[in-house]
Amino acid sequence: MKFNRCFGCMEEIQGYPCPHCGFDPRSVKGIEYALPMGTILAGKYLVGRVLGQGGFGITYVGWDIALERKVAIKEYYPSGQVSRNPGSRGLTWYTSVQSQQAKQNGTQIFLKEARKMSKVDDIPNVVRVRDLFQENETAYIVMDFVEGETLKARLEKTGPLPWEQAKGIFLPAIQAMEQVHQAGLVHRDISPDNLMLTPDGKVKILDLGAAKDLSVNNGASSMQVAKGGFSPFEQYTQRGSSGPWTDVYAMAATVYYTLTGK
C-alpha cells in the first residue's frame, strides 16, 4: 500500500523534498532502532519520522488512514531492555530475568496507565488519547497531534525568558496540571520538551504515557521514569512513591530552566 504523504509533516506530496516542510528522508539520518518510515500499524496508522524519544518510549508523527488526520504515536521502547534491528519492526527483548519480567508486565502497565488518561480528555490544555493497541512485541498509544513548537525548542532559539512572558506559558500549564491531579493522576514527566506552544498562543501538556494512577499502590509504579534536571529524587528509585509533589517539583524545575537557562 502506497501513500503519497510526506513522512515529515503528513501533507500530500508528489515527491521529495516536501514543498510544505522541506523534509527529505534521503538526506536525514534516522534513529536506527526506530520503526521504518512508511510502516503501517494496526492496519490504519501510517508511521512517519521520529518526533522525540525518552527512557521508555519513541514518539512518531503519524497519519490516521481511516479518519484522514495527523496523529502522534508513542511506542513503548524501554531503554536498556529491548533492541530492534535496523529496518525491522519487531522488538527483541533481552534475555535477563529483569527484561523478561518487563516484557510480561511492562506493556500491560504501559497500556493500563495510558487508559487512565481518558479521565483528562476534557482538559483543554492536555493532549487527548485516541487509541491503544499492542503489536510488534510492544504497545502503542495514539494521541492528537499538536501543531507548534515545544518550550525546549523555543528556548533554544530565544534563550531564557522574562517572567512576564513565561507566566503566560506556566499559569495555564499549572492549572491543567492541577486538573490532572484532581482526576487522580500524576504526569511524572513534566519538562520543557513536554510543553507544546501552539501557533494561537496556547500551551498543551504532552506525553501522559508515563502517567500514574494515584489510587493504585499508593502512587508507586513499576515503570521507572526519570529525566535529568527535572525529575525529583523519588523517580530515581524503584521504591519511590509518586504524587502531586512529583509534578510540582518538575514544573518548578521547568520554570527555573525557562527563566535562567540552567
Residues covered by each model-derived region:
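Protein kinase catalytic-loop region centered on the HRD/HxD motif
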Residues: 173-185
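Conserved short submotifs of the Hanks-type protein kinase catalytic core
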Residues: 136-150, 154
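AlphaC helix of the eukaryotic protein kinase fold
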Residues: 85-119
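Activation-segment/catalytic-loop signature of the eukaryotic protein kinase fold
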Residues: 131-132
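Activation segment signature within eukaryotic-like protein kinase domains
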Residues: 169-170
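Conserved activation segment of eukaryotic-like protein kinases, specifically the C-terminal portion
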Residues: 220-234
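Conserved end of the kinase activation segment
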Residues: 234-244
